[in-house]
Amino acid sequence: MNYSKAKYIMGAAKVSQLPEDTGVEVAFAGRSNAGKSSALNTLTDQKGLARVSKTPGRTQLINLFDLGNNNRLVDLPGYGYAKVSESIKRQWQSEMENYLTSRKCLNGIVLLVDLRHELKEFDSLMIEMAISFDLNLHILLTKADKLNNKERAQANRMIESFLKTFVSTDKISYQLFSSLTKMGLDKFKEKLDTWYQ
């Protein structure tokens, strides 16, 4: 798959506004400041494709990017400490859950986790939903360039023990990743390629 061909299609506030439910979609999800926009920009080799915001939680729409041949990347709203009301946060979460449960063309979720921090409730929720709906899930442990080898090994052990608390499934995988140094980029592309086949 040539990810550099990605083009922005649209942003939708509701699942009902999304294009026809055909082809293949891979959704990117993550807490605010997990490095989601940076990862999308690195994957597509386009600096400005997904807007990198200095204000966490600015991604409020479901943003779609076309890869050609009815394949799409989907940028889900950043979840976390956005400066919006609780009711709007609940609305975002409701739409995100609606997307994950109802979109038949969704073939996998990329969950971005800043490996400098412990996994949070949102991360657990995403893993549980992926297992419940039998979806592929690939966890990108972002900002790996900010840790030394010993700290990276500790992060790997942390995610391994964390995943052991869930039902065992071969549909969940994880890796270290850095948008800055492109560490893990080739491995990430290989994983996505299998989902778009």
Curated annotation (Swiss-Prot):
It comes from the Bacteria. GO terms for cellular component: cytosol. GO terms for molecular function: GTP binding; metal ion binding. GTP binds at residues 30-37, 57-61, 75-78, 142-145, 177-179. Gene3D superfamilies: P-loop containing nucleotide triphosphate hydrolases. Pfam families: MMR_HSR1. HAMAP family: GTPase_EngB (MF_00321). This is Probable GTP-binding protein EngB. The lineage of its organism: Bacteria, Pseudomonadati, Pseudomonadota, Gammaproteobacteria, Thiotrichales. The gene is engB.
